[in-house]
Amino acid sequence: MNNSLENTISFEEYIRVKARSVPQHRMKEFLDSLASKGPEALQEFQQTATTTMVYQQGGNCIYTDSTEVAGSLLELACPVTTSVQPQTQQEQQIQVQQPQQVQVQVQVQQSPQQVSAQQLSPQFTVHQPAEQPIQVQVQIQGQAPQSAAPSIQTPSLQSPSPSQLQAAQIQVQHVQAAQQIQAAEIPEEHIPHQQIQAQLVAGQSLAGGQQIQIQTVGALSPPPSQQGSPREGERRVGTASVLQPVKKRKVDMPITVSYAISGQPVATVLAIPQGQQQSYVSLRPDLLTVDSAHLYSATGTITSPTGETWTIPVYSAQPRGDPQQQSITHIAIPQEAYNAVHVSGSPKALAAVKLEDDKEKMVGTTSVVKNSHEEVVQTLANSLFPAQFMNGNIHIPVAVQAVAGTYQNTAQTVHIWDPQQQPQQQTAQEQTPPPQQQQQQLQVTCSAQTVQVAEVEPQSQPQPSPELLLPNSLKPEEGLEVWKNWAQTKNAELEKDAQNRLAPIGRRQLLRFQEDLISSAVAELNYGLCLMTREARNGEGEPYDPDVLYYIFLCIQKYLFENGRVDDIFSDLYYVRFTEWLHEVLKDVQPRVTPLGYVLPSHVTEEMLWECKQLGAHSPSTLLTTLMFFNTKYFLLKTVDQHMKLAFSKVLRQTKKSPSNPKDKSTSIRYLKALGIHQTGQKVTDDMYAEQTENPENPLRCPIKLYDFYLFKCPQSVKGRNDTFYLTPEPVVAPNSPIWYSVQPISREQMGQMLTRILVIREIQEAIAVANATTMH
């Protein structure tokens, strides 16, 4: 055999060549595999090709690649597959200590309902067993000492003589049919379909044995008027650009439906979602952060077929001096649970129910008032209506519209019940009950009757005004539509001005803005965005609110990314003029408060910034913005001066072992709050620190992982400095570049622009509001 050896190399040389192509973060794994498997390991380690694009911006080169994140942060991306096993049956008994004994029994069964797979993230797998019907039956029985039924006279009762209170029975039935939701070109999945059936039985000593029974059967599906909406279908779509299921937007909407008639006490009926009792702990107010797996289970949150996820604010373990906030638990109830009811009856019936428990304390308020004519009680059927704090409670406005009787076709105004504004005057003819009767939590004043409550057709529901609709995610087509409308209006103005003026000699072609964002040049897009900050108008011809305008620009940014443009309009050097103009619009933004005292939440949410790559490690500027966002949210640094005082030496990294399992460790970074106000030699305690904890469920959004990655990309000489924390990004970098930042801190002007955009985010405003409320108490 005459085999030529000219083009052959030794095995050791081949290993050296192969090792050069192995990524640095997999080198240890390569060497270990080579020692154990031998030559077979060479086939396993192939360098994956990534498309890296570098485009020119003046004297700077900006990178982009298809890896979605940069450098060593890729190894943090671990796809998660979670199996959701539905509970077939549950029986819970809760003993509530009150003046009367109360027993609650819950039975749960489940049956599937077809919804769009858009509600689930791409790598989220659902395992569903056989079809099982779900029923929740709650029965509360209470006994109280019997006494003679007193005679009560009120001016509201139109009777010739005082009426004796008799046994009354109220039956409420609320049925909604299961609905199917389908989205175009998306495979369907089966998720549990819930039907809730509740029965409430309580006794009262006022009327010698009265009984109230309330039974509701509701299917968690939207009304037909909302199924056909394409925007609602788009709202349920989660982003597919990350390796893990993306958290959906959590709307902090504990629902308490209530309205009252002047001079009367308030009736209260509270629906408790299944599987939530274990999640409520009477602790410090905080927004519950639920990982992606919990978004689709029955614990912690409720995800309705419309795509909205209801989040429960819980409390953390510091005791509080304010007894009112210790006794309040806000419960999220799906939209269909308070949709619309049809009330008929003659006399007024009023009831109040209060349930208390050692671990969870609830106060719910819902009033049921029956006049001499039929009424339609319709809530603003919008699951995105901003529910806010008012005197420790959260309320939803209720619109009362008369459809029969003396007030036919007359719409009444919206009433928001406030416990402190409740009328104090009582009827002179009403007799004062004995002290033992005043202690009862259930009070009923009515004559023998039966009241039927049925669902009203969805067509009769009042349509919420557009300003009440708060989006859950970015809609790129909305940003494109606003740009097109503005471009058409601006081009018409330019043409009109050109006709009224004489064209100068040698004049170039008339400037026209292209309606297609993708084909717009960088300079043209920058100039157009600058003008939009001042000239953009909504459908009514009015200027956009600052937070809505910021939301539109985020939609435009997402549209550019989704269509192949790598421009970052918030950080690229070519868009400096636009960021300056946007800063002028946003710098004086304060949370909007309605005349009734409600704080309207911002249109911009944290999830939206993750969607359009304004948070994360996609570039040096984005990583710097992410660190400032976390420092504002958790360290509560609200001003530029506070951020300027932050330094590497003042941020401490701490690792704790779990008391139950020493092998489990949790890492956090801490910052001494109000640094400088503590006296010299004063002992520093844990409550003096603000803390950021790790997020093991999603490492790509973990504050600790991103802080470590920031330190990894900073020069070694600045990591111990005590005068700076935010460094200037280098103009030309690559994803695998070891240094992303210079040793110079960012300017005060640049920091102010970044912080202004951060303070508009809804979660930041909520965190600051909770901190202010805590300091006031």
UniProtKB/Swiss-Prot annotation:
Position of the Glycyl lysine isopeptide (Lys-Gly) (interchain with G-Cter in SUMO2) cross-link: 354, 359
Region spans: Disordered: 140-164, 219-240, 420-440
Domain CARD, chain residue ranges per copy: 6-48
One GO-annotated biological process of the protein: kidney development
GO cellular-component term (any): cytoplasm
CDD domains: CARD
Modified residues (Phosphoserine): 346, 465
Top-level taxon: Eukaryota
InterPro entries linked to this entry: DUF3504, ZnF_MYMT-QRICH1
Function: Transcriptional regulator that acts as a mediator of the integrated stress response (ISR) through transcriptional control of protein homeostasis under conditions of ER stress. Controls the outcome of the unfolded protein response (UPR), an ER-stress response pathway that either promotes recovery of ER homeostasis and cell survival, or triggers the terminal UPR which elicits programmed cell death when ER stress is prolonged and unresolved.
Protein name per Swiss-Prot or TrEMBL: Transcriptional regulator QRICH1
Species of provenance: Mus musculus
